[in-house]
Amino acid sequence: MASEIFGIAAVFWVLIPVGLAGGALLLKLQKD
């Protein structure tokens, strides 16, 4: 069960920065 929690945490650790970077990129593209 602990492995499942660590797996979910790892997914969030990856998705959150990627989502923020993707959102920033979209904003930059829309401004140009």
Curated annotation (Swiss-Prot):
The primary site where this protein sits is membrane
Sorted keywords for this record are: Electron transport, Membrane, Photosynthesis, Thylakoid, Transmembrane, Transmembrane helix, Transport
Q: Which Pfam families does the UniProt record give?
A: PetM
Q: How does it sit in the membrane?
A: Single-pass membrane protein
Any one GO MF annotation of this record: electron transfer activity
Tell me where the signal peptide lies.
none
Question: Which GO terms fall under biological process for this protein?
Answer: photosynthesis
Which InterPro entries does its entry note?
A: PetM_cyt_b6/f_cplx_su7
Q: Name one GO cellular component term.
A: plasma membrane-derived thylakoid membrane
Listed transmembrane segments: 9-27
Answer yes or no on keyword Transport.
Answer: yes
Key word Transmembrane present: yes
* Localization: Cellular thylakoid membrane
Q: Which family does it belong to?
A: Belongs to the PetM family.
Q: Subunit info?
A: The 4 large subunits of the cytochrome b6-f complex are cytochrome b6, subunit IV (17 kDa polypeptide, PetD), cytochrome f and the Rieske protein, while the 4 small subunits are PetG, PetL, PetM and PetN. The complex functions as a dimer.
Q: Which HAMAP family match?
A: Cytb6_f_PetM (MF_00396)
Its function, per the record, reads:
Component of the cytochrome b6-f complex, which mediates electron transfer between photosystem II (PSII) and photosystem I (PSI), cyclic electron flow around PSI, and state transitions.
State the protein's name: Cytochrome b6-f complex subunit 7
**Species whose genome carries this gene:** Synechococcus sp. (strain WH7803)
